[in-house]
């Protein structure tokens, strides 16, 4: 408070919680326009600016908030200080000499600068105004203030008083204003509230709420920072009137009605009917007499929780929300961060709704119509720390604004939100008694786009049985090789004849149309002969993997009513052990040659079953899916995702009981190509498999995603001859796809998606490129012969971009399940968009991406895919629950960072059980890939308030028992660190294996924790270590090794890049200062050094550089005083024989003398330097200020005594600020320091601005020019 004397102070008191939050953001983001309110008004008529300025000074005197500054340093708790007197000045700018477009440009430039300028709340008047004169009676008024002093509800009061005074002064008449209550009365009221009672209310209100209501799927992933943008629109006068009447009919407010509509809209973007978002409440307690006339910041953000129970109507929802509002009103003063602490998840609110009014025109006109001017085209700019805000203002035509962060949301998405909001309001006005679940947000235009614009046009191809297509391939080239296995090859003619013999034998034993033949074989030529033989007999085949548990095979044979079992002679004994009483035939029985080799006379319909494939089921037993001949034709004939040729050689690496084999077999056999079947030994050896690809000149293959990743890691040569690799079954790994794309080139990789019920895959994504920003691969677009719809639970189309259930129709949709009419009816429904077609509900979640491809978004249920196998976790749970001694069980699948997944079981046991016993039981019932990797025994399963298992509370599977889950500190040092973390993170108990960031940490808290550790333990812990080893155990291990990586003085940014820049810190002393710079140089690894306080700093810098770049020319960088440090380091490196190619310097002069400064001057300069360098978030915290001062003081003391002498061979590139470019003595000072090339360029901004914000963007372009300049280095 040194800038103000006690005589200037009228009052002092604490801040409201909302003010504290805004002050925090102002400190955290200096120079940014968070919570800046900027109102622009065009004024027509006679405006007396001097009179207006005098009127605003009257308002300044009247309301304490306009004379308030905010102090947060050297006080235990921030306070607001009311000054007795402050003088307000309106800036006048005459633009009458400019053209209209020039005037607009000047005003826009001022507005942008005004936003960037912000307010220094510790000293500035928190309000300013500028009036631009455009013509004699045409003005533009820009009025800005910080939201910390005023909210929208107050603005009408202020404006009304302002114009009352203005009119009186203009007409030289007296005026009188009623007395006002100070804002301090509200602060006093706050301190008297029973906060604990209110916290209990919010805890009960939020109990059971899980997740977060967010538009996460619509967020961009490319940019950081906040770029404000808004979309304004309004309801028509008739719609506004009808909507208002609707609210009144249910005795609620227009604000509550808008919240109800928004709830309906956002529910379509969630997978829950339990929603929460922020609402801005007026916060004016009725207990304070005259509160409606008080001015200040009263508003607060509180959560609005909305439960859309089944069948609830819009009118019912309005009543429920109004009741909630009344109940919560006494507790709406509680700050959001305290309410947040009562919730079960780390972040409760993602976006907010604001219903307020800026009645400038109304307030002005209320006072007088004789004041000589009119205000038109009033525009309000405001920016919060939420990426999306829905704002509305009442009026004859209700104004709605979607204010958003353009770096996070696309304009196209915001436009869709607008359309959906208007569509919902229009429907609800017409029928408020309809269930909200039936409201359709998709208008006619979007509906047409979703139905026809995103799906391929229907194709009129005649369907034929598979035997027809195979015979066509045989006739086309009978002597061409068709099938190869383990060195044996059959031509198309030979394969056809062998299949015909098997078909005839099957028919003699009663297998034909309408029957099922089980194929119980190994990978072999006979496998394919058997499949074709079954089809030619008119039957459907049932692939049975001999490795499956006997009980599972028995169930499949019985459930499918298999008429025959077809196997090999060598598997005769194994087959005999099966509990099967039907006919068993042998594919390789020599008596088959007794049968004729010609085609059997069989009438096959394309809609006849071709095979039955069993997949995991929720009942505890697998379910058999029936796939027809026509289904398979839709997959491999007349398709658009790739072209097939009789010159292709396919490789099959899939289990024949897995539907990927369907593609291998039919795509090759029905298109006259060659099929190579890899044997079991080859499948288990990546080297043998890649050798086989090369030896057999394979050019097409389908692999599960897991196998594709494995092969991609195995080498490159095998990919070079392939013209197409298809992969699917799990989420694709972007790094693996990127590697394969680099080797194979565009258009040769296809990511496939589809369930067994959709016949292998229904969508395909042909990879042409992979932008650096991409983090997941789309599953593509619907293939020809298929249509895809993304629907909600009511089978309505989801809005474009919203997540919903992916549903498939078209030729690939199967007939349903064997003996499961109930499940078939549930999952296979009539297509509501194409009468006569069947629609399959996959249970998968997905959404349309802007480019018309589809993004997979998980499962509705607990089904997972592991290594391509579809697994119902319920099936495993039911098997566990049936095991004697198990009281209850739950199974979860965890996806690791590597992309691998594991199944983990949690059991509550009645008697003492061992994991080995349970695992042995499951192995008898389930395929090996369904047996959990871990078994954890609990006393009871954690439950939600709804009685469901709370899977989020299950312990990590690598922990033994729940009671042993937490491991506390092991020594005094760990206890101290745990206590620091506890205070910084607001957590009561910290274990040594708890992740700092998982507990709510972020970069600012990491800086705070590191500063506290140094202060209390004397350990100089690099902040970057918390990102690399974010547990107390990890820190301990690091310290035991003495920080043995040797890199504690360097922060490495853009770690994956190869080209390195070594950056020396400015006088503030921390490499983190270059965090913003690194984002503008994404192609360079930026190794940013901290200032090393020890005297051998140059040797240590040289050692670090040697570790990080052992060879090759070096690039050094410095900003301000860091340039001198870089120069000294370059001399040391050149002495050691290293080649320094260039030193890039930003705004520095060569130090040629010692500065004569005493300790007090150093201290004040350090304080000033820290104030200038507050742009970086990580360096802007009171908690780290002591550490920053120490580091800055050390560097400053070194720098003032430094004299830069000698020369380097390195080139020197100097980028100066605009002002320094005009100082020739600065420009020349570094030229004599190099025998190499010396370049100077004029940059943008002042010295302090050069590496900040938009100025940095422009200067980074010049730095890139320097970096891209090639010079010859002579050693």
Curated annotation (Swiss-Prot):
Signal peptide: none
Cofactor names: pantetheine 4'-phosphate
Origin superkingdom: Bacteria
A molecular function (GO) term: phosphopantetheine binding
Cofactor binding annotation: Binds 1 phosphopantetheine covalently.
Sections of the chain in a coiled coil: none
Biological-process GO terms, alphabetical: amino acid activation for nonribosomal peptide biosynthetic process; antibiotic biosynthetic process; lipid biosynthetic process; secondary metabolite biosynthetic process; sporulation resulting in formation of a cellular spore
Modification O-(pantetheine 4'-phosphoryl)serine occurs at: 1003
Region described as Thioesterase: 1059-1271
Pathway note: Antibiotic biosynthesis; surfactin biosynthesis
NCBIfam families associated with the record: AA-adenyl-dom
Function: Probably activates a leucine.
Protein name as annotated: Surfactin synthase subunit 3
Organism: Bacillus subtilis (strain 168)
Encoding gene (name): srfAC
